[in-house]
UniProtKB/Swiss-Prot annotation:
Family to which the UniProt record says this protein belongs: Belongs to the ADP-ribosylglycohydrolase family.
Compartment(s) where it occurs, according to its Swiss-Prot or TrEMBL record: Cytoplasm, Myofibril, Sarcomere
Tissue: Expressed in heart (at protein level). A short form is detected in both heart and tadpole tail (at protein level).
UniProt keyword list: Cytoplasm
Protein name listed in UniProt: Inactive ADP-ribosyltransferase arh2
InterPro entries assigned: ADP-ribosylarg_hydro, ADP-ribosylglycohydrolase, Ribosyl_crysJ1, Ribosyl_crysJ1_sf
Gene Ontology MF terms: ADP-ribosylarginine hydrolase activity; magnesium ion binding
Organism of derivation: Xenopus laevis
Knocked-out gene: effects: Morpholino knockdown results in defective embryonic cardiogenesis with hearts forming small ventricles that do not beat. Defective endocardial maturation with endocardial cells showing a rounded morphology and no clear lumen forming in the heart. Myofibril assembly is disrupted in the developing ventricle, preventing ventricle outgrowth.
Protein purpose: Required for myofibril assembly and outgrowth of the cardiac chambers in the developing heart. Appears to be catalytically inactive, showing no activity against O-acetyl-ADP-ribose.
Major subcellular location class: cytoplasm
Amino acid sequence: MEKFKAAMLLAGTGDALGYKNFSWVFCASGVKIQEELKQLGGLENLVLSIDGWPVSNNTLMHIATAESLVSDYWSIEDLYRDMVKRYIDVVDKLQGRRPDPATIEGCAHLKPDNYLLAWHTPFNEKGSGFGAATKAMCIGMRYWKPGRLETLIEVSIESGRMTHNHPTGFLGSLCTALFTSYAIQEKPLAQWGREMLKLLPMAEEYCKKTIRHMAEYQEHWFYFEAKWQFYLEEREIAEENENKPKFPDKYDAEERDKAYKTWSSEGRGGRRGHDAPMIAYDALLGAGGDWKELCNRAMFHGGEGGATGSIAGCLYGLLYGISKVPKSLYQQLEMKERLENLGEKLYHLATMEK
């Protein structure tokens, strides 16, 4: 249970660190961010509180997903209706947090008063952003057992489509949910990427059954898959017998920014649903259990550090717990009790199931 609590809490910590009250989100240089961090006294001397280090809409939407998952819904459709209401409620309260525009636009299409079609939204050409991925980690925590795989796939896709109805967006949601389930199942880290790719045909079959006009999704579907295949080949972990990721000899903040740009679709690492989980995953592969190194790789770079940080923080919590993380980074964190409470509830619900 402690790791579930750590996962929810460190997702918030990673978000707050990478976001830095919006000031680091638009900084395109990881080197500059790390210089500023030194001037602040270094990671271990930061005190994250609501005043200078609030969480962003990533954490608020993740909380909304988790609260739906621990509610007393009586069917999957009922769960979706609850998610719709909670997402709209969050968006209504986002003044001052400068939310992801795709999330705002996606929520505008939700219909909370329409019992049958509440969560059905149209295909959105602009819905490829990271916001679906950063609110879905808890789905993999709720349905982590192998016997719940179909539910995990369905719920992560539908939750993603509510706000980001574009394959690059909602497959990011599937990806982060799968990764959290793999962390709890203790699958070797180097296998996660290829295990996820193996399940994309299953996800596609589900979408073909539930999406009327699948044709407009198809070309974007292959983009997500191709980007991940390219990444796994670059790290030399694409094949079954490849379990030792290969990193460049020089992979400092400047080189990482360059790499993250090549994986992106618009020159800013972590802005989309494919590369936000990718950067978090790459950071975990490179950092292992070293929290400070994870932060350097996933939170402090010239891309969307709040998004990649929240995913990486959550996965780190499930893999390693919270003991190596400085207490000043979470003791005064905004919504700390709420996050820990949700971690506890997710644990109890997931373990109660046979």
